[in-house]
Amino acid sequence: MIQVLIDADNLSAPQLRALVAALPAGGMRIVVAGSPRALASVAWPPRATVIAVGGWQQADLRLAAAYRLTDEPLVLGSGDGDFSLLAVNHPGPVLVISDRPASRLRGAGTVTDPVTDGTAVLRRWLDEVAG
């Protein structure tokens, strides 16, 4: 099962919408955290766990707590360097969704911005890891 962690405060509304639109209907565990305003900008799939938070770093803390260490693929919807160690040490393939990822995230796996790059890279990566 592909693990998807999304920091709604770290991506723009168009990036969030493009990411959600590209995700397949099944085989995913989706957890999204962010401010109520950021969360309201997207129609989240019913299968997503949506966590509204307030305050600095609260979305990061909730997503870190939701992370599961498995060798299954990880999609990280954030360019925040706070997730660098998580992504670098993840034993499975990692896809980072961001237009300006922290330098350590760039070395963790594939990086794409579905707005600038289109969704082809994202969809191809998902197809490859799904086998």
Can you say where each PLM-predicted feature lies in the sequence?
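N-terminal extension/subdomain marker
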Residues: 1-29
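Nuclease catalytic cores that cleave nucleic-acid phosphodiester bonds
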Residues: 29-131
